[in-house]
Amino acid sequence: MDIKLINIGFGNIVSARRIVAIVSPESAPIKRIIQEARDRGMLIDATYGRRTRAVIITDSDHIILSAVQPETVAHRLSSREPLASAEEPVD
């Protein structure tokens, strides 16, 4: 089974299958989503102290903050050639 992994910056990688949305962090509703995820313990900050440029929403209700532009993450997600891939060993 081939798993497509997406680099979201600074060596952080997310499974492409788990991504539901990639959005910009500027709007009030997205800021609320980030705060609610922080309160629930479902926020993953992958910015390494840099400015948040993309908010990735996953199917498990985790919210991931990335310092990479949303367009860049989307381009990596839609590219035919995965940046990183892993194959599950066959028993």
UniProtKB/Swiss-Prot annotation:
HAMAP family given in the database record = RemA
Per the UniProt entry, the signal peptide is none
**Alphabetized InterPro entries for the sequence:** RemA-like
Record's family? Belongs to the RemA family.
| The name this protein goes by in its record | Putative regulatory protein Moth_0891
Q: Please tell me the species this chain comes from.
A: Moorella thermoacetica (strain ATCC 39073 / JCM 9320)
Q: Which Pfam families match?
A: RemA-like (PF04025)
